[in-house]
Amino acid sequence: MARSTGKDAQALFHSLRSAYAATPTTLKIIDLYVGFAVFTALIQVVYMAIVGSFPFNSFLSGVLSCVGTAVLAVCLRIQVNKDNKEFKDLPPERAFADFVLCNLVLHLVIMNFLG
Amino acid sequence: MVNDGTFYFDEKLVNMREQQGPLATTSSVVRGLTAFSSVITESLNLTGDKILGIAKFFLGIGIPGDTKNFFDQVDSLACLENNRVSIPLILSLPSTVISLTKKDSLKVKVNTVLGSHAPPLTVTLVRAFSSSARDNSIIENQELKFDPQDAVYFLDDLPASFDVGEYIFVFKMLVQDSEQQTVYATGTLTQVPIYVTGLIKIENAKIAVLDSDLGSVETQKKLDLAGESTVSVSANHLQKLRLSFQMSTPLGNAFKPHQAFLRLRHETKVEHTFVVGSSGKKFEITLDFLGLVEKFFYLSGRYDIQLTVGDAVMENSLLRDIGYVELDLPEPPENASRPPPQPVDPYTRYGPKAEITHIFRAPEKRPPQELSLAFLVLTILPLFGFIIGLLRLGVNLKNFPTSAVPATFAVIFHLGIAAVLLLYVLFWLKLDLFTTLKTLCFLGVFLMVVGHRTLSHLASASAKLKSA
């Protein structure tokens, strides 16, 4: 039984990889961006775990900037994805403009909270 | 006429504006009297007592406050000094204290009002009696001898029965030349209070601690009140403290001083004072601590003992710390009264206080700088990973518009975003929110315009591509 689950997991993984290769490049860029943001957040959490959370507001602002920008990127991905029926009429440039604007606002707040 | 032998005139309150006091009134009477008597040939019928009374009034008021009164006083005395009615003679004593130890003699001076010499007189001490026993006169009719060098009348030795105390001496003066007796006013009798002082013998002084129930002596120590030595005793609240001594005059009589106090002072400066009672020559005070426990506020510890014995006629009055007593009192109950607060030295109360140094909050433990820098580098790494990933994906920059106008807009768009991010960095470093928001407004509006242009251009380009 374990061997079959192991084999199933591998098969699942392979199919996932092949399916992913079919996604358009733009979406891959956005995915990469999300990964980068999350990874940065993780590194900050590890740092805080090591040295303690003395300027807690700084830690929060750092992590939240990463998480916020990841969330905005995910929203962008949803809006830009052509397979998504809901946002068919929304031009991708408009979505990108929203993404940029929201990021700027987010980063203003983050900079204020950074201290 | 007043009881102390002075005599003066006062004015009836007729006119408020022109009111003069008794001094001015009497002096104007004297001036008139002496001026009148100097011009008439007959003598005025005036008793010497009245003139003497007026003279004593002027001499008895001290030095008046204002110049007019002072002038009146001196002028009247000058009139009286040499007037034709009768010249008053004043008897005075240079010292009213006679010390038995120094063997002082009684000295008496007789002068006119302004201090000039009197004619030869016979001064007699009529009576001398103790102020406490007025009927019993010790000296009677003793004539005083005259010392021409100092111009004093003196009495050489006082009789042996003169003990210390307060006395009243009564003198009488008589002008030796009988013809001149009407010229001078000597008065009848003059009373003078005299103090006779001497060394009082204090002996047999002892301090003892007694057992309260039986009255038996537990410790007894001799005191040397004349010297400097101190004693120390200890007692608890079940015992009594007894201090006793004997006092006698130089002649051996019993002596009751004006002040005989015993004071106990605690380390905390709380004091208690007691009067030493006497019977004849024996002075004794017993402090029963059982009854005094509450009065002493239940304070145990070391009490300094101070004895005070004094009187005006005692030449060896003493105020001395004679030692201390270690007192052991029980614990105070709940509702015992607290001792009264002792006066605080005003310099310590209003003086500078201890300096307060502010203790700052200990700063938080910061990580070592190398660790922080390492993690900074680690955090930047994902960015590079992102860029590398982008390149690997083969991101195309082909869609970047090449024609002039849209290109500029695209470039300006990217520059605009970079400018906003730079503004944020400046905001973190040194700007405040208000300037940042103001600048952001301008930049934001600018960016929106440019962005709209660029993106709409891109959108139209992709739409053209789609439709084509």
From Swiss-Prot, chain A:
Per the record, the coiled-coil ranges are none
Query: InterPro entries annotated for this entry?
Result: DAD/Ost2 (IPR003038)
Which ranges sit in the Cytoplasmic compartment? Answer: 1-31, 77-94
Q: Where in the cell is it found?
A: Endoplasmic reticulum membrane
Q: Which residues lie on this side of the membrane: Lumenal?
A: 53-55
Is Membrane among the key words of this record? yes
Any one GO biological process = protein N-linked glycosylation
Q: Does the keyword Membrane apply?
A: yes
| Transmembrane region(s) | 32-52, 56-76, 95-115
Its biological function?
A: Subunit of the oligosaccharyl transferase (OST) complex that catalyzes the initial transfer of a defined glycan (Glc(3)Man(9)GlcNAc(2) in eukaryotes) from the lipid carrier dolichol-pyrophosphate to an asparagine residue within an Asn-X-Ser/Thr consensus motif in nascent polypeptide chains, the first step in protein N-glycosylation. N-glycosylation occurs cotranslationally and the complex associates with the Sec61 complex at the channel-forming translocon complex that mediates protein translocation across the endoplasmic reticulum (ER). All subunits are required for a maximal enzyme activity.
Instruction: Spell out the family assignment given in the record's similarity comment.
Output: Belongs to the DAD/OST2 family.
Name-wise, this protein is: Dolichyl-diphosphooligosaccharide--protein glycosyltransferase subunit DAD1
The species this protein belongs to is Citrus unshiu (Satsuma mandarin)
| The organism's taxonomic lineage, starting at the top | Eukaryota, Viridiplantae, Streptophyta, Embryophyta, Tracheophyta
